[in-house]
Every structure is written in C-alpha cells, then in structure tokens.
C-alpha cells in the first residue's frame, strides 16, 4: 500500500494537486504522514473494502489543516485554514440509484445535520459521489435525470448550495467521471456542490483522463479562487463646516462669546 501511495503522490504532484478526496483506499482509520505528503483516512466498519474516505494533502498544505472529522463510513469532513476564510470539505458517497430510499433519506439527513454545524463563515464544498445523473445543468453530460438527481436538487436548494460541476463549459470528455470496464459506458456521477455565496470562486472543474490512480473514475480537478470585494470611496468625503462665516467680524465675535460662556 505504501508503494501505491508514493506512486499516487508522484501523479498528483505532477498535476499540482494540493488537497484530494479519495474513497475506498485504506481499511483502518488513521492519519499517515510521510516526507512530503499525508493521508487522512476515515476507515471502515466492515472489512469488505467498501466505503471509507480519505484526504490526501501535499506537504506544503499540511500547515493549513485545522481538523479531520469522521462522520461514518460514508461521510467525512476536512477543514482547512485560508487567509480570509476557513474551508470545509465534505466527502460523501451515497447509495446507487436502485438502493433503498430510506437509506438515502437517512444519509441526507445526517449530511444536513453536519452542514448546520459548520461555521457560517466557512466555505462549504461538498464532493458528492451520489451516483447521480443531472440533466438540468447548462453544461451537464446527460439529458436525462434519475431519482438520485431529484433527491440531490431537493437537498441543494434549501441548504444554500450550488451544483458547480454542471455549470462550467467543457468538452464531454472532460465531464466524464466514471467509465465501464469495456469503456463503452461513461457517466457524470461525481459532482461538486458549493455554498451559493462562493459559487463564482470556482473557476474550473474538469475530469482528468491521464492520471494513473488505479480507479475506474476519472479524477475531477477543481480550481478555486476567492476574490474579495473592496469597499471603495473617499473617506475624507465629509461635509465641511461653514468656516467662511468667520470672515465676518460680527459672526466671529458672537462665536467667541458663546464659546467663552460655555467655559
């Protein structure tokens, strides 16, 4: 496993990745630090190599890590400190479209509870593997939708989130996040949700086809840049007192008398 992680680190370093969310790569719950990167792993309740979530962090970004929280085997949270805001990443893997609807509702309720616990000033980014085909976005790969898509939209709107992965224009090959073993079937089932307030900070989202990550998923890359609005205006633009009236000797004398009377 260590050798595979080093190969993965080399791939991610070549692509200039600093923080990466993974799924199903390590059995035990742990934080493993190496010379120039670290892996935060949520572990599993079962030993069947299903679920479990991980965050890879490059060495230069380790100093910005503020916390890693394991919710359960399907959800984990990762918090980073930035210059003006902190950023909370939520890695979630939901059931497939055919699974029990009650399990999906329970998972969404748990996700909502944890979102509500995040500081209001934080940038919230949800990395959503919900096996969802979204057919409503301007730049979605799919024309049709599935049941999971409806549940996601019902979750996004009341929680002040935006599905950015279907809003940024790209060729279809850069929207494909999953492919079948024979390469004939491709889907866009991995989505990026972000707080409405910071939706314009996502400058690019594209699925990379080249990295050798040992997965049947193409690795989506997110570029994120927050621009702060600077309040402009002349701070000296204040109403001036009518000092010209003191050029009149009469007003000048009356003003001096009133000032003396006050003391």
Segments from the language model and where they lie:
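A shared catalytic/ligand-binding motif for oxyanion handling
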Residues: 1-263
